[in-house]
Each structure stands twice: as structure tokens, then as C-alpha cells.
Regions:
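Repeat-blade elements of multi-bladed beta-propeller folds
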Residues: 62, 138-146, 177-207, 221-249, ...
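A short beta-strand motif characteristic of beta-propeller blades
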Residues: 164-176, 216-222, 257-263, 301-307, ...
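Short loop/turn segments that connect beta-strands within beta-propeller blades
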Residues: 211-214, 252-255, 296-300, 336-340, ...
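Solvent-exposed beta-strand/loop surfaces, strongest in extracytoplasmic domains of secreted
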Residues: 6-11, 25-141, 159, 167-170
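Short, tryptophan-glycine- and acidic/Ser/Thr-enriched carbohydrate-recognition patches
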Residues: 144-156
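C-terminal segment of classical bacterial N-terminal signal peptides
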Residues: 17-25
């Protein structure tokens, strides 16, 4: 700025200059310090099991690590297969834990995502695949289910694309192959395959729980008892083992821990597989006449006993309508689930040598040691027909599948002519059916998948050893195949083969 003064008269003009500096902007402040760098992290995810049945509990652990210390914060577990969030858990010493039974059936892709913090960057684990078998895909007793109908409604492998997943040889005492006898029919449940193996050097058997994915032994336990008989059933994440002397023992299916043991009273020869159904284990025993027992799955207490002519060899067949057993001389029984006798189909003879009955629709298919197999009405016990089969028949809602003279035959249950026949006279196993295919084994060691509709061969594979048929009268170990949790499992001597996709 300049000021000017003009001279008046003789005065002199003076110029005054004033320089003002511009003011600093009001928004200018000192810059804040830079934040510390955010450390990188890595997240990994593990599971207590990667092959489970639907509704089974699985524990996941997400571990978050960093070179800069132990991360804090939380991790979210997501099923990337459908985008569902299974939960969020806080890190404790770098690990977040999730326990869930909410996995849907199928192969699920689980992802753990760490959200990060002020000091640690977010990160996600690689997807972890968990195979979840649909409920109902378990094989829980002889011939798959409590009706013994050989039918697996869910969990069937693709019969046209079967390959051998594993083959294991199972031994006698202490896992040694010394004394190894025959392998029993398998029970398939909760990501495991359960079998018993006869010990030919001593009395008793061994119970094995195998990883269904690999065939590796998860746990095993010796089952004492007279002779080499034992048999299994499964329900409620519990495996039930019965020995020849009538000792019924419950084990945790996941750990092998013994939960309880009950000595069944009054009889001394137990030669039929148990059947577990809706919280109760049903057992047939012989010696002094015979009994059918109902035992609580929760505590092993005997709930009731039903008297029969002879209690050997016939595994109880059970559904909502009652408990059915079939003995020699066509001595067949139906008990209510509460233990009262509903009917007794009898003939003029008595004797031992029963065989496992099969339930399908409104009928009971009964077999004795030396009798013509008979078809009885479930409601009344009256005879409605006969059938021919060397083994327990299987059903799929369309056909009855039998083994007749070493061939697999599809029978129209209404009595029409046979629909088809397959085989060369060497087929020996009780058939099982699932996913539109009938599976059967040959004494040559071959296993076949046959179209249920046409009888045409879909697939054939080798079990690796001789396959035996079920000798319900003479053998200590009852053998048979099973389908469950996406596997076809086949005993062959002292080995067990599993086929899948």
C-alpha cells in the first residue's frame, strides 16, 4: 500500500509505502505422524473330520499367524458352496474354534476369513472340502437297515464309475495278521466303516472302526466271548456289539470309548445280529428255548423279553409296526414295540436254525434253515405266498431281488414271471440295491453292479480275494456287503474292499 501527500504551495510531496505479508490459510496444520505398518497374516483351516454324516457335529479350527506377533480379532466361517455364514468366533491365542452340525449334504467348501485389526491385515484360508453324507445313507445293521431289505435310499455311488478306494487286510489280536479270520458285514456311519473280525487262534473277535475315506484304523477293541461270533448295529452315534455269550456293549462310534455293557439274562447262545431302532436295541437269543430282548440304547437296561420257540440265527427286523423274527419250521413272530405278542405263525414242527426276516411293504419274508421261504402278512401273520432265495432278498419298491442257483433274479412281487436274471451260477452274496443298481458278489472274487431296470451289467470289479456268501447256520461270522455314505463295501476273507467315485 502506498500513501501520497501532495505539496500545497511550496510543500514537497512525500510517498509512504507499507508492505503487508499475506495471511496464512486457516486450514494449514502440522501433518500427523504416519500410522505403523499393518502386518500381513496367514489363515489356515482344519476340521475334526472331512467325511461325516448329515447332522453330525464337526469342529473347525482357524489359525491366524503373523511374523509380527499374535493376531487378535475374529474369524468368520463360511460355506462357500452356498454362501451361508456358519458363525463368527474370536481369536484366542491366534485360534478361532467353531463347532457345527449344520452342514448340508454334499461336498461343502468351507472358508475361514480373518477380518483383520489395526495392526494385522485380513486374510482367508484356502477352501477346505468336507463330504457330508445325506441322512439315511448309513448302513446300520445286516442288510443295511432295520428292515433288512438291502435297500439304500441315499448315498449311492455312481455305479458306472466305481473305482477301488481302498483295500485293507484286518488281523487278529493287537492288529497282527496272526489268527485273522473272516470279516463281518460292514456297518457304515458317521464317516467310518465298522466290522468285526474272527480271531481263529483264541476265542472272541476284534471290532475295527475304519476311516471311510482311507481305510485306516481309527480305533479297535477286542471283544471277548465263546467262539468267534460277534455282530454290530448302529444308532445315535453309538455302535452296539453283541458276542456269542450275550454280552451287549455300547461304544462311542467316534472314539471307541465303552459307554455301557449288559449281560443279557436267561439264554446262552447268541448268534444273530442286533438291530438298533429308535433308541432301542433288539436282540435274539437261544439256549433254553429262546427270547427276543429289547434293550435301552441309553443305559443298557432290558426293557422287555418276548418268548419264542428258538432264538438263534434270526436278526430282528423292525419298523414302526413292530418287531419280527423268523425261525425254523416257519415259526415266525410279531411283537409290538412295547413287547406284547401280536401274532405267532406256527406249523407242526419245532427246531432251531432261523434266518433273518425281511420287511417290505405289508409283508414279512421269512426263511428257516430247511423250509420253503414264506411270505406272511405283517398285519395278521397269515401266509400270502412263498419265494425262492438262497439269501435274504432285497427290495427297491419295484422288484424283489433274490439269489437262486447262483444267479441274481429280479422278481415281480405281484407274482408275475421273473423280470430278468443275471449271473453264471457263482453269485453268493445277499444282494443290495441303491441308485438304480443292484450290487452282488461272486465266489470268484468279482463284484458286479447290475441295472435294476434291465439286468444288464453296469460295472465289475475285483475285491482281491474270495467272496463268501452268508452262512447263517454254520459260520461264526455273518458276512455281507453294504452301500452307504457313497461307498460300496465288500468283505473278502480277512480283507475289506471299498469302492466309490
Amino acid at each position: 500500500m502506498r500513501w501520497y501527500v501532495r505539496a500545497l504551495g511550496g510543500c514537497v510531496a512525500v510517498a509512504v509505502g507499507l508492505l503487508l505479508s499475506p495471511a496464512s490459510p486457516a486450514s494449514a496444520h502440522p501433518k500427523p505422524p504416519k500410522p505403523p505398518p499393518v502386518a500381513t497374516t496367514s489363515t489356515t483351516l482344519t476340521a475334526s473330520a472331512t467325511s461325516v454324516a448329515q447332522d453330525s457335529w464337526v469342529t473347525f479350527k482357524a489359525q491366524v499367524t503373523s511374523n509380527a506377533g499374535t493376531p487378535a480379532g475374529s474369524v468368520t466361517l463360511t460355506d462357500a458352496s452356498d454362501g451361508s455364514i456358519l458363525g463368527t468366533s474370536a481369536l484366542v491365542s491366534g485360534t478361532a474354534t467353531f463347532t457345527t452340525a449344520a452342514l448340508a449334504p454334499g461336498t461343502r467348501q468351507l472358508v475361514a476369513s480373518y477380518g483383520g485389526s489395526t495392526s494385522f491385515a485380513p486374510s482367508s484360508a484356502a477352501a477346505l472340502a468336507v463330504s457330508v453324507a445325506q441322512t439315511g445313507s448309513d448302513a446300520v445293521t445286516y442288510q443295511i437297515d432295520p428292515s433288512h431289505d438291502g435297500r439304500q435310499a441315499f448315498g449311492a455311488p455312481d455305479a458306472s464309475a466305481l473305482t477301488q478306494k481302498w483295500n485293507v487286510t484286518l488281523g487278529g489280536t493287537g492288529g497282527s495278521l496272526a489268527g485273522a479270520g473272516d470279516v463281518s458285514y460292514p456297518v457304515i456311519a458317521g464317516g467310518r466303516v465298522f466290522v468285526t473280525v474272527e480271531n481263529t487262534q483264541t476265542y472272541g473277535t476284534n471290532l475295527f472302526a475304519l476311516d471311510a475315506s482311507t481305510g485306516a484304523t481309527d480305533w479297535s477293541v477286542g471283544l471277548a466271548g465263546t467262539y468267534g461270533f460277534s455282530a454290530l448295529a448302529y444308532d445315535g452315534q453309538t455302535i452296539f456289539a453283541l458276542n456269542y455269550d450275550g454280552l451287549l456293549t455300547a461304544f462311542s462310534a467316534s472314539t471307541g470309548q465303552e459307554l455301557w455293557a449288559t449281560q443279557l439274562p436267561d439264554q446262552w447262545a447268541f448268534t444273530a445280529p442286533p438291530t438298533a431302532y429308535d433308541g432301542v436295541v433288539y436282540v435274539s437269543g437261544a439256549g433254553y428255548g429262546g427270547y427276543v430282548y429289547a434293550v435301552s440304547e441309553a443305559d443298557g437296561l432290558v426293557q422287555w423279553e418276548g418268548t419264542v420257540e428258538n432264538g438263534d440265527k434270526s436278526s430282528p427286523a423292525v419298523d414302526d409296526s413292530g418287531v419280527y423274527v423268523s425261525y425254523a419250521c416257519q415259526q415266525d413272530y410279531r411283537f409290538s414295540l412295547s413287547g406284547s405278542l401280536v401274532w405267532h405263525h406256527t406249523t407242526s414242527c419245532e427246531g432251531g436254525g432261523g434266518s433273518t426276516a425281511v420287511l417290505d411293504g405289508g409283508n414279512v419274508y421269512g426263511r428257516g434253515a430247511h423250509d420253503t421261504p414264506v411270505i406272511l402278512s405283517k398285519s395278521s401273520g397269515t401266509t400270502v405266498g412263498t419265494f425262492a432265495s438262497q439269501t435274504a432278498p432285497a427290495f427297491d419298491g419295484n422288484n424283489m431281488y433274490t439269489i437262486d442257483n447262483g444267479n441274481l433274479v429280479a422278481v415281480d412281487p405281484s407274482g408275475s414271471p421273473d423280470r430278468w436274471s443275471f449271473g453264471d451260477g457263482t453269485l453268493v452274496t445277499a444282494p443290495v440295491v441303491s441308485g438304480g443298481a443292484v450290487f452282488v458278489g461272486s465266489s470268484t472274487g468279482m463284484v458286479y453292479a447290475v441295472s435294476a431296470a434291465t439286468g444288464q451289467q453296469i460295472w465289475a470289479g475285483a475285491a482281491g480275494s474270495v467272496i463268501m456268501g452268508p452262512d447263517e447256520q454254520n459260520a461264526d461270522v455273518l458276512v455281507g456287503m453294504a452301500v452307504g455314505d457313497g461307498l460300496l463295501v465288500v468283505p473278502a476273507g480277512n480283507a475289506l474292499a471299498a469302492f466309490g467315485n
